C-alpha cells in the first residue's frame, strides 16, 4: 500500500494512505499508543472507514481509574469513540502477573473485535528487538525468532502493527512535537520483568558498542520471518503425503522423513488443526513414538486441552470430551436431536415428524452388551464388533448405546441391529451420531 508521511516531522511513523479496513486501536494511554491514536485520528480516511479505541482496565495499579479517565478525555478531545473494558487478572494462575495480565488483555481484544476489524497495536522497532532477544534466550527456532508479525489473523479480524518498522525515538519526537500527553506506567520500568531488564540494562549496553544494534536485531527478526515462511511452504506441501484419509499422521510415512523435517511436520499438523502450539517436550515425546515400531502401542501426549494419541501405527489429534456420568441415561423418541453429555448428538434423519413407536433408552456402554446384526440368527458381543471397526478406542468408549427393553438396537451409528435396520429401511430413515468436534 502507498504510504504518506505524518505531518510536521520527517522520519515520524508512516501509515498507509488507505486504511486496510475499520480500525480498533488498543489504547493503553502510554506514549506509543498515544502517538498511534493521534496519527489515526488525523486521517479522514481512517475515520470514514471506522475508527474506535479500546482501553483495558486491569485494576492492578492504584492509578488505574485515573488512567482510564485520561484515555476517555483524550479520545473525547479527538472525537474517537472509546470502549473501556475492566478485566480480572488471575494472580494465582502460575503464569506470573505480567503474563496473566497479557492473557486477560488479549481476551478482551478478541471479544471486542468486530468481524473484519483491524486491531491496531503500537509496537515499534525497539519492541521488536526486545522480542527477538527474548526468543533467542529461550532457544527459539525461526518461527519464534520472527518475533512480532506486522499483521496476522486474530479472533474475527486482523492484528495489525503499523509502526513496527519505526524506532521509539521517532515516536517520542512526534509526541513532543505535537505536545501529546501520555501515561507512564511504573511497571514498565520494573527490572524484575525480563523485557524491562533488556530495555533498561542490556540494549543500552549493546548500543554503546554497536549503535545499530536495535536495527540489526529487528532485521534479524525479519530474516527469520522470511525463512519461517519458506519452511512453512515446504511443510504444507509435504504434509498431505504423511496423512491418512481421516487426517491422522501415518507413522510409516513419517519415518521416511528426516528427524528435523518430522519435527516440523508434527508442528504443522497441529497448527493446521488450530490447536495450541506443540511444546518442545511434546515433539521429543512424539519422536519416540515415531521411532518405536511396536504395533500395539497406545501412547498419549496431552497439553492445553489437546491430546495426540497413538493407535494402529498412526497419530491422532483430538480434544478430549467430557466424561459421561456413570448413571446418565435418557429416553429418546427421535423427534428432536438428543444432546449427549460429552457434547455429541444423536439424530434420526428422515421424513418430518418421524419418530420411534416407543421411546428408546440411551445410555453409555456398561460392558457385556450383545447385539443381533442384520441377517444373523445369533447375537455378538458388542465389544468384539467395535474392536473390528476402524474406530479409535477413545471414540468407542463414547458411543451411546440404544436399547429397547433388554435388546440392544445400536451403538451410535456404527453398529445397527437387525431389528432397527429393518425399521430404518422401512421408513427411509437413518441414525446419525455426531461427535462434539463434528457437531461444531
Swiss-Prot record:
Enzyme class: ligase
Residues the entry annotates as binding ATP: 28-33
Alphabetical keyword list: ATP-binding, Cytoplasm, Ligase, Nucleotide-binding, tRNA processing
The keyword ATP-binding appears for this protein: yes
GO cellular component, one term: cytoplasm
Gene Ontology terms: biological process: tRNA modification
Localization per record: Cytoplasm
EC number in record: 6.3.4.19
Job description of the protein: Ligates lysine onto the cytidine present at position 34 of the AUA codon-specific tRNA(Ile) that contains the anticodon CAU, in an ATP-dependent manner. Cytidine is converted to lysidine, thus changing the amino acid specificity of the tRNA from methionine to isoleucine.
Family the UniProt entry places it in: Belongs to the tRNA(Ile)-lysidine synthase family.
Protein name, as recorded: tRNA(Ile)-lysidine synthase
Upper lineage: Bacteria, Pseudomonadati, Pseudomonadota, Gammaproteobacteria, Lysobacterales
Gene: tilS
